[in-house]
């Protein structure tokens, strides 16, 4: 084959024209210390706080400490192959994850990578893990209810869409159970749920996944998990990943519910990272910015205004206390950030009242504006009645003879407590809750034994669902207890009282 000189010259000219003299600057550093999930690097002169770093073995780290002579980075992995002298490259990016509709029904890790063995997830978009919270003008006040399906919560500590309500209590008092019941109750209500498990046993997370799958709730739920054996960095990032996934749905005009289970473990992971990075310790050895750790996460929960599509993100953070001490550092921090708290007591739990909510110190600061009118009609005085009952019960232990009015009040209170008892994974609709409280408030249980109240309520709900289904339809559509609905309810209660008496 003979080459012509003009052909060669034209190829050379074309190459010269297409040549782009672009200098690509890559910022490299060298590891001089590594261990305990922390690496110290020198030579990385142009690096941002929070920037992702790539190590020789493919491990990703986050630059957290920018010091005069070196950079302190936390590793998203075990980093066992990183050695002293290894090269590190600054990527110029901050942590971001893929988001999209494909995440529904999936279990992912702190970097939104699937870990359920169902293959890759198709994503529509990416979002920064650390996004700014919506501003004041972007929000509107909480005004729509988010029903948990638990009578005690929906009646006395109501939650609205866009609210942040803390669930706080000792270990094994039913905190996760309340959160899971709330997810189950969102079925058919167009609410997308994100459950974030931080520092939990893999078996506990598997149990939650199975419960949601069996009850058809996994279809509208995303589970983000950083198990107890995960690196502290991944446990620290997991809640932000959950919030980012929920934000995607919130900004596409949907309602979302995020559960952080639990933030005590995230704070402990952050404390571990900070101490290893030699940041100065503060109260309980937590770093000085641990309040900011939680405030910037929980402030992302919001009810957006109409111009932004009216989406919402409701947050239910969980915090574990030691011996019921709510005055410890992390509990007081999160209480001050949130819009109320549901306090669970070990003593109440052990006495057989479940959910074990201590009504006296539980509060919802903004939820009453979102409570359905039907619930307000029947539950207005419920909290006061229960508080008076608790006071009288404590006093009656020392008094030998009580007058008839006090005895009646104690009897009514004991029956109201029975109404609030509820089995796990069995949330109730608004109409069923209203019927239960209405019957208790109006003395229909006064002639029943305390232990007969719950069997009676189960039978009454079945009767209302079958023979008197119009009652449920009216309450569901009008959201109020109309005179017609009240008449039907009275008729059903009276009829079932006779039937229940005959059964005895």
UniProtKB/Swiss-Prot annotation:
Residues noted as binding ATP in the record, renumbered to the chain: 169-176
Membrane topology, record value: Peripheral membrane protein
EC number: 7.1.2.2
Gene designation per UniProt: atpA
Site positions (Required for activity): 362
Name of this chain's protein: ATP synthase subunit alpha, chloroplastic
Quaternary structure, from the entry: F-type ATPases have 2 components, CF(1) - the catalytic core - and CF(0) - the membrane proton channel. CF(1) has five subunits: alpha(3), beta(3), gamma(1), delta(1), epsilon(1). CF(0) has four main subunits: a, b, b' and c.
Main location: plastid
Similarity section: Belongs to the ATPase alpha/beta chains family.
Keywords tagged on the record: ATP synthesis, ATP-binding, CF(1), Chloroplast, Hydrogen ion transport, Ion transport, Membrane, Nucleotide-binding, Plastid, Thylakoid, Translocase, Transport
GO cellular component, one term: proton-transporting ATP synthase complex
Catalytic activity: ATP + H2O + 4 H(+)(in) = ADP + phosphate + 5 H(+)(out)
Organism: Stigeoclonium helveticum
NCBIfam families associated with the record: atpA, PRK13343.1
HAMAP family: ATP_synth_alpha_bact
CDD domains: ATP-synt_F1_alpha_C (cd18113), ATP-synt_F1_alpha_N (cd18116), F1-ATPase_alpha_CD (cd01132)
Function: Produces ATP from ADP in the presence of a proton gradient across the membrane. The alpha chain is a regulatory subunit.
A GO molecular-function annotation: ADP binding
Record's subcellular location: Plastid, Chloroplast thylakoid membrane
SUPFAM superfamilies to which the protein is assigned, alphabetical: C-terminal domain of alpha and beta subunits of F1 ATP synthase, N-terminal domain of alpha and beta subunits of F1 ATP synthase, P-loop containing nucleoside triphosphate hydrolases
InterPro entries: ATP_synth_asu-like_sf, ATP_synth_asu_C, ATP_synth_asu_C_sf, ATP_synth_F1_a_nt-bd_dom, ATP_synth_F1_asu, ATPase_a/bsu_AS, ATPase_F1/V1/A1_a/bsu_N, ATPase_F1/V1/A1_a/bsu_N_sf
């Amino acid at each position: 084959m003979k080459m012509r000189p003009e052909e060669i010259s034209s190829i050379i000219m074309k190459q010269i024209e297409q040549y782009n003299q672009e200098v690509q600057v890559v910022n490299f550093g060298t590891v001089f210390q590594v261990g305990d999930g922390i690496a110290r690097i020198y030579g990385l002169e142009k690096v941002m706080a929070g920037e992702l770093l790539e190590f020789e073995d493919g491990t990703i780290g986050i630059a957290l400490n920018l010091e005069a002579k070196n950079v302190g980075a936390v590793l998203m992995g075990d980093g066992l192959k990183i050695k002293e002298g290894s090269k590190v490259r600054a990527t110029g990016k901050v942590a971001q994850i893929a988001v999209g509709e494909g995440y529904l029904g999936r279990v992912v890790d702190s970097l939104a990578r699937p870990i359920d063995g169902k293959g890759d997830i198709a994503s529509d978009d990416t979002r920064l893990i650390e996004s700014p919270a919506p501003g004041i003008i972007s929000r509107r006040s909480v005004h729509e209810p988010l029903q948990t399906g638990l009578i005690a919560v929906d009646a006395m500590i109501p939650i609205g869409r866009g609210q942040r309500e803390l669930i706080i209590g000792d270990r094994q008092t039913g905190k996760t159970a309340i959160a899971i019941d709330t997810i189950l109750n969102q079925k058919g209500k167009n609410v997308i749920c994100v459950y974030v498990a931080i520092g939990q046993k893999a078996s506990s997370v598997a149990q939650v996944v199975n419960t949601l799958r069996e009850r058809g709730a996994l279809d509208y739920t995303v589970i983000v998990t950083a198990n107890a054996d995960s690196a502290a960095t991944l446990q620290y990032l997991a809640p932000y990943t959950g919030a980012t996934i929920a934000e995607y749905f919130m900004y596409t005009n949907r309602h979302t519910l995020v559960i952080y289970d639990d933030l005590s473990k995230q704070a402990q992971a952050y404390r571990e990272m900070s101490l290893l990075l030699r940041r100065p310790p503060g109260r309980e050895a937590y770093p000085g910015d641990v309040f900011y750790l939680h405030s910037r996460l929980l402030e992302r929960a919001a009810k957006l205004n109409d111009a932004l599509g009216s989406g919402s993100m409701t947050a239910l953070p969980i915090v574990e206390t030691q011996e019921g001490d709510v005055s410890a550092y992390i509990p007081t921090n999160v209480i001050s950030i949130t819009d109320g708290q549901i306090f669970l007591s070990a003593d109440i739990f052990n006495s057989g009242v479940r959910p074990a909510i201590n009504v006296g110190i539980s509060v919802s600061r903004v939820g009453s504006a979102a409570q359905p009118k039907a619930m307000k009609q029947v539950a207005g005085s419920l909290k006061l009645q229960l508080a008076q009952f608790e006071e009288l019960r404590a006093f009656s232990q020392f008094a030998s003879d009580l007058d008839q009015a006090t005895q009646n009040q104690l009897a009514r209170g004991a029956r109201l407590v029975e109404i609030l008892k509820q089995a796990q994974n069995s949330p109730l609709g608004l109409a069923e809750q209203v019927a239960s409280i209405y019957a208790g408030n109006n003395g229909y249980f006064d002639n029943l034994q305390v232990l007969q109240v719950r069997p009676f309520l189960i039978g009454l709900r079945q009767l209302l669902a079958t023979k008197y289904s119009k009652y449920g339809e009216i309450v569901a559509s009008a959201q109020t207890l109309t005179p017609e609905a009240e008449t039907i309810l009275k008729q059903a209660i009276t009829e079932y009282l006779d039937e229940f008496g005959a059964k005895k």
